[in-house]
UniProtKB/Swiss-Prot annotation:
<dbReference type="GO" id="GO:0070006">
    <property type="term" value="F:metalloaminopeptidase activity"/>
</dbReference>
<keyword id="KW-1003">Cell membrane</keyword>
<feature type="binding site">
    <location>
        <position position="410"/>
    </location>
    <ligand>
        <name>Zn(2+)</name>
    </ligand>
</feature>
<dbReference type="InterPro" id="IPR045357">
    <property type="entry name" value="Aminopeptidase_N-like_N"/>
</dbReference>
<feature type="modified residue" description="Sulfotyrosine">
    <location>
        <position position="176"/>
    </location>
</feature>
<dbReference type="Pfam" id="PF01433">
    <property type="entry name" value="Peptidase_M1"/>
</dbReference>
<keyword id="KW-0031">Aminopeptidase</keyword>
<keyword id="KW-1015">Disulfide bond</keyword>
<feature type="glycosylation site" description="N-linked (GlcNAc...) asparagine">
    <location>
        <position position="234"/>
    </location>
</feature>
<feature type="topological domain" description="Extracellular">
    <location>
        <begin position="33"/>
        <end position="965"/>
    </location>
</feature>
<dbReference type="InterPro" id="IPR050344">
    <property type="entry name" value="Peptidase_M1_aminopeptidases"/>
</dbReference>
<feature type="binding site">
    <location>
        <begin position="351"/>
        <end position="355"/>
    </location>
    <ligand>
        <name>substrate</name>
    </ligand>
</feature>
<dbReference type="InterPro" id="IPR034016">
    <property type="entry name" value="M1_APN-typ"/>
</dbReference>
<dbReference type="InterPro" id="IPR027268">
    <property type="entry name" value="Peptidase_M4/M1_CTD_sf"/>
</dbReference>
<keyword id="KW-0482">Metalloprotease</keyword>
<comment type="function">
    <text>Broad specificity aminopeptidase which plays a role in the final digestion of peptides generated from hydrolysis of proteins by gastric and pancreatic proteases. Also involved in the processing of various peptides including peptide hormones, such as angiotensin III and IV, neuropeptides, and chemokines. May also be involved the cleavage of peptides bound to major histocompatibility complex class II molecules of antigen presenting cells. May have a role in angiogenesis and promote cholesterol crystallization.</text>
</comment>
<dbReference type="GO" id="GO:0008270">
    <property type="term" value="F:zinc ion binding"/>
</dbReference>
Length: 965
């Protein structure tokens, strides 16, 4: 699944006035899942009463829970192994007499008895069953031995089970089939089998669609809903004959429903063995564009009819074939299915979902309008497609055994998405962006004592809520970062060789991460060119099984080098011990005298002449930031690097110019450097035109903005930024022919946006005139938007910030009329830029009205308001006053409480705010915090670190900005 949530990586770039993601700020992934919610509210909720349901035997369990009973444990017993399912579903896309949208279904599951048992335990959630005889299900044996009679059945809501108690025992090695009929609500909760709605031609349209990951297939039909319980699925959909039915496989048969010719019955080919969370089925009136790949795979891009008619699916179609071919070559394994459908949904909580053969997306992650979409929208489409298609092999064909190794699925896809996207767009240099988008972003979280390892013991991950918490930036971005490091020190060829062997060995089955290490080790052992200081497992377990990362410190006078666990607050203690004592085996590529070399740090400290320099030499470690660690030097080497940057910055690789800024700011935040050193590392920016160093600087300085934009420090800081960005603004003014054209490369186009955003926010009058003039032209002729799509986010935001009610109301009207989701997203974010308190308060009230703001967008909109210094207090008051209602309304649906808590607390830096946060935790302990539980602990830790940092650095920072502005 793509990162959420969560927030598009590239959309974040366009919203710099509100703040580029701070390196020292906790950021959850954008793209978060519909399941990433607290399940307690769901577990206590009663399934909707639906017409035709019949009562059965006991429906609830005794409040006194006997944990020894298998149905009171969250993990399935190993007694039964599913073989296949026959599932028929009929969604009703108009409400019934009670005003509910429902679906009806029937299911037959065939399973083998693996251990003798007298109870059948299968997942079921919010389903009402129609009795078969006296019980919810019917059971029969395949073979001569009859099945035992059913004694009773019960629904255990806490563990989400349908439990069938038998009068006798199932026989080990024998097969059985169990039938059921059921009804469920086709709710708008973005989970399981749900409905999505949109307007077209003034009419409301309803789509029946799915989101099963991580634990919501059970909400659609009774199933063994764990990733290792792979089976073949035979799906049949009954649907109105004017609509199209899709599923993981191609249709096998389509016929008219005999009893009602206005309905069709579409039966699909059986799937290969696969996990329940990868199932998908959709009923809609969407249209498609199609192509056939060179490997004869049918490719279709589905979306709302108007979007397809206007060509908004063409770009996705253009890049899908090349990306599929790239991964087939990269994995040395053919694409496993005959077709690849990708569909853009109006309501979808995650960024996308890798359902096998039927990938679902948010509209903004799949549709692209060349006339209205920006270059960042285009980059988002190609990278998210690459992420999801990478999963078709790594995750779908071979699947982790349990969610504790989710990082292997998502981290791998988050790494190779850059490779696949780079293949589709070779001129964009996308592979470098992983440093900004993943490595540096996740280090902000992983530097906290409350972080967690990539892989957890399986017994620590049991409940749906615990599973949901794993869908975070550690899983995605740290996973990507350490796998990239592994590929780098092995070489890409060896990495691919081991990967191919792994996929061929475990196809259609499940693995743990150690299986990958074993196959990579086999690749290493098959050659002699690459020599490692230890086995792959010995090296990598230190990066997987302990949280955090090291800072590598080198003294260029003595050649001494040592490592230590980097913590943002060096006085804090890790929340869990490490078997490796927080030491790593560290690969260190370095640059000295213009030559690159490589070194392994295998112990806590060492000494080497390789790291000694003469008076006119400087040393640079972690070339191109392939390693997942930060680097510190003696002060003399730092000064040499600064002199080099201000003399001839081109000698230092672009990525390392960004690294110098990023690492030094983080080291200063942790008290390992004087804060003036990283500030001095930004002086060269007056001569810098490349995107990555500027982005690293703005991200780092955004932390200063968050800490000081309510204090006297902010004035001198703005003056310094204005001084530094003025040459960049002038550079792009010339390069773009006075803003009429766009720079030729992706990175330059991104830095043009940085130049305008920073110039406007720091008070450059020429920038203000530019954005106000462009926005006024649009207001005077709303049918003709003169603002280039690349610049719209920053122009909209700044014009609304400089303006008043009239500018805001115009943007709101355009947002309400927007038919392209990318344009709507830009406007929705910009509406939070107002400096009028009453306008922001009104906008805040809109966010919880689904008629104004879709549920999937509520969190990001509220966080956008909180990012605005004027709106931050409003949001905090709103959240505290309404937490219980927020939790009740969104706790089991689309609301990402982790994003919300992180977004509203990122400015907290006073004792008073810490007290408020602690009181908030105490006041709402009974209600709970859902997927925000870990985020709340991180917010408390971060607030304490902020308080300490501000006390220690405020006066020094004020003095430095005053002297240098």
């Amino acid at each position: 699944m793509a990162k959420g949530f969560y927030i598009s990586k590239t959309l974040g770039i366009l919203g710099i006035l509100l703040g580029v993601a701070a390196v020292c700020t906790i950021i959850a992934l954008s793209v978060v899942y519909a399941q990433e919610k607290n399940r307690n509210a769901e577990n206590s909720a009663i399934a909707p009463t639906l017409p035709g349901s019949t009562s059965a035997t006991t429906s609830t369990t005794n409040p006194a829970i006997d944990e020894s009973k298998p149905w009171n444990q969250y993990r399935l017993p190993k007694t039964l192994i599913p073989d296949s399912y026959q599932v028929t579903l009929r969604p009703y896309l108009t409400p019934n007499e009670q005003g509910l949208y429902i679906f009806k279904g029937s299911s037959t599951v065939r399973f083998t008895c693996n251990e003798t048992t007298n109870v059948i335990i299968i997942h079921s959630k919010k389903l009402n069953y129609t009795n078969k005889g006296n019980h919810r299900v019917a059971l029969r044996a395949l073979g001569d031995t009859p099945a035992p009679n059913i004694d009773t059945t019960e629904l255990v809501e806490r563990t989400e089970y349908l439990v069938v108690h038998l009068q006798g025992s199932l026989v080990k090695g024998h097969q059985y089939e169990m039938d059921s009929e059921f009804q469920g609500e086709l709710a708008d909760d973005l989970a399981g089998f749900y409905r999505s709605e949109y307007m077209e031609g003034g009419n409301k349209k309803v789509v029946a669609t799915t989101q099963m990951q991580a634990a919501d297939a059970r909400k659609s039909f009774p199933c063994f809903d764990e990733p290792a319980m792979k089976a073949s699925f035979n799906i049949t959909l009954i649907h109105p004959n004017n609509l199209t039915a899709l599923s993981n496989m191609l249709p096998k048969d389509s016929r008219t429903l005999q009893e009602d010719p206005s309905w069709n019955v579409t039966e699909f080919h059986p799937t290969p063995k696969m996990s329940t969370y990868l199932l998908a089925y959709i009923v809609s009136e969407f249209k498609y564009v199609e192509a056939v790949s060179p490997n004869r795979v049918q490719i279709r891009i589905w979306a709302r009819p108007s979007a397809i008619d206007e060509g908004h699916g063409d770009y996705a179609l253009q890049v899908t074939g090349p990306i599929l071919n790239f991964f087939a070559q990269h994995y040395n394994t053919a694409y496993p299915l005959e077709k690849s459908d990708q569909i853009a949904l109006p309501d979808f909580n995650a960024g996308a979902m890798e359902n096998w053969g039927l990938v679902t997306y948010r509209e903004s992650a799949l549709v692209f309008d060349p006339q209205s979409s920006s270059i960042s929208n285009k980059e988002r489409v190609v990278t998210v497609i690459a992420h999801e298609l990478a999963h078709q092999w790594f995750g779908n064909l071979v699947t982790v055994d349990w969610w504790n190794d989710l990082w292997l699925n998502e981290g791998f896809a988050s790494y190779v998405e850059f490779l696949g996207a780079d293949y589709a767009e070779p001129t964009w240099n996308l592979k470098d962006l992983i440093v900004l988008n993943d490595v540096y972003r996740v280090m902000a979280v992983d530097a906290l004592a409350s972080s967690h390892p990539l892989s957890s013991p399986a017994n620590e991950v049991n409940t749906p809520a615990q599973i949901s918490e794993l869908f975070d930036s550690i899983t995605y971005s740290k996973g990507a970062s350490v796998l990239r490091m592994l590929s780098s020190f092995l070489t890409e060829d060896l990495f691919k060789k081991g990967l191919s062997s792994y996929l061929h060995t475990f196809q259609y089955s499940n693995t743990i991460y150690l299986d990958l290490w074993e196959h990579l080790q086999q690749a290493v052992d098959s050659q002699t060119a690459i020599k490692l200081p230890a086995s792959v497992s010995t090296i990598m377990d230190r990066w997987i099984l302990q949280m955090g990362f090291p800072v590598i410190t080198v003294n260029t006078s003595t050649g001494e080098i040592y490592q230590e666990h980097f913590l943002l607050d060096p006085t804090s203690k890790p929340t869990r011990p490490s078997d490796f004592n927080y030491l790593w085996i560290v690969p260190i590529p370095y640059l000295k005298n213009g030559k690159e070399d490589h070194y392994w740090l295998e112990t806590e400290k060492n000494q080497s002449a390789e790291f000694q320099t003469s008076s006119n030499e400087w040393l640079l470690l972690n070339i191109n930031v392939t390693g997942y660690y930060q680097v510190n030097y003696d002060e003399n080497n730092w000064r040499k690097i600064q002199n080099q940057l201000q003399t001839d910055l081109s000698v230092i690789p672009v990525i390392n110019r960004a690294q110098i800024i990023h690492d030094s700011f983080n080291l200063a935040s942790a008290g390992k450097l004087s804060i003036t050193l990283p500030l001095s590392n930004t002086l060269f920016l007056a001569s810098e035109t490349e995107y990555m160093p500027w982005e690293a600087a703005l991200s780092s300085l955004n932390y200063f903005k968050l800490m000081f934009d309510r204090s006297e420090v902010y004035g001198p800081m703005k003056r310094y930024l204005k001084k530094q960005v003025t040459p960049l603004f002038a550079y792009f003014k010339i390069k773009t022919n006075n803003w009429l054209d766009r720079p030729p490369t992706l990175m330059e186009q991104y830095n043009e946006i940085n130049a305008i955003s920073t110039a406007c926010s720091s008070g450059l009058e020429e920038c203000r005139d530019l954005v106000v003039g462009l926005y006024s032209q649009w207001m005077n002729n709303s049918d003709n938007n003169p603002i280039h799509p690349n610049l719209r986010s920053t122009v909209y935001c700044n014009a609304i910030a400089f303006g008043g009610e009239e500018e805001w109301n115009f943007a709101w009207e355009q947002f309400r009329k927007a038919t392209l989701v990318n344009e709507a997203d830009k406007l929705r974010s910009a509406l939070a830029c107002s400096n009028e308190v009453w306008i922001l308060n009104r906008y805040l009230s809109y966010t919880l009205n689904p008629d104004y703001i879709r549920k999937q967008d509520a969190t990001s909109t509220i966080v956008s308001i909180a990012n605005n210094v004027v709106g931050q207090t409003l949001v905090w008051d709103f959240v505290r006053s309404n937490w219980k209602k927020l939790f009740e309304d969104y706790g089991g649906g689309s609301f990402s409480f982790a994003n919300l808590i992180q977004g509203v607390t990122r400015r907290f830096s006073s004792e008073f705010e810490l007290q408020q946060l602690e009181q908030f935790k105490e006041d709402n302990s009974a209600t709970g915090f859902g997927s925000g539980t870990r985020a709340l602990e991180q917010a408390l830790e971060k607030t304490k670190a902020n308080i300490k940092w501000v006390k220690e650095n405020k006066d020094v920072v004020l003095k430095w900005f005053t002297e240098n502005s």
